[in-house]
Amino acid sequence: MKANRKKLEIAMAKACMNTEDLQGKSGMPRPTVNNVISGRSVRPRTIGEVAKALGVDVTEIIETEN
């Protein structure tokens, strides 16, 4: 599962968070957060934890196929 980078950046901006803030709030290691932000494939649970930390529904930040 991948995060949509633009949607993720918008959610981070709305939450007034940078990468370090997201790392702290999600409790995930920096490389994992960087993988999510970079659009690399990660486990669904990881995307879920990021969405939870940002206070958004996971569907708002995932990459969807057209």
Q: Residues of each region from the PLM?
A:
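Recognition helix of helix-turn-helix/homeodomain-like DNA-binding domains
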Residues: 27-42
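Short, basic-rich loop-to-helix N-cap that marks the start of a DNA-contacting helix
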Residues: 39-52
